[in-house]
Amino acid sequence: DEADYRELDIFEFPDADADCRFGTDAAGYLLEMTPRDGSAPARYRMAYGAAAARSDITPGHNPALFRFGVWILFNIAALPLGAVAFHSSVIRYRGRGVLFLGESGTGKSTHTRLWREHIPGAELLNDDSPIIRATDSEALVHGSPWSGKTPCYRNESCPIAAVVRLSQAPHNRIRRLRPIESIGALL
């Protein structure tokens, strides 16, 4: 019902050249993605506390609208369980995960590829959107069905050893971030 709809965000989805609206109403969450080419919008609805959703998406829609819609709804369902997907690339090395965060085009996939090529035992866990889950005793990183430039769909997990925020620069440097910088790097 439009009368009780509350818009939470409006944003662009460049992968499908679409404009997105995300909001809530009395029944739950609503995600609507409208392609700029004039084709039919894709809508997803998920009730509060539900683990399932409904959509009007059809085989004629851009597949990116399906992948992104399911990713958003997965995050809504996973958050109360202490889990969230992060835009990052993850290496597993010696049984622990190292997440590389950064804006698109920063070199996350390149960085993890270089680890695999030059560090024996380094393997890719996920290349775009791993799931991070906090338990009472540790933080874990899980592979996911969403991968990036390098197809990698592993149903595996490991404890997190480090989170590295990448930025492009004319020099190589690494430093530990202060706590407030760390929060900003994750968000």
Please state what every model-predicted region is.
Residues H111:
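Hydrophobic positions on the alpha1 helix immediately C-terminal to the Walker A/P-loop
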Residues K108:
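Conserved lysine of the Walker
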Residues D1-S104, L114-E123, P130-L187:
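A noncatalytic interaction/capping subdomain that flanks phosphate/NTP-handling catalytic cores
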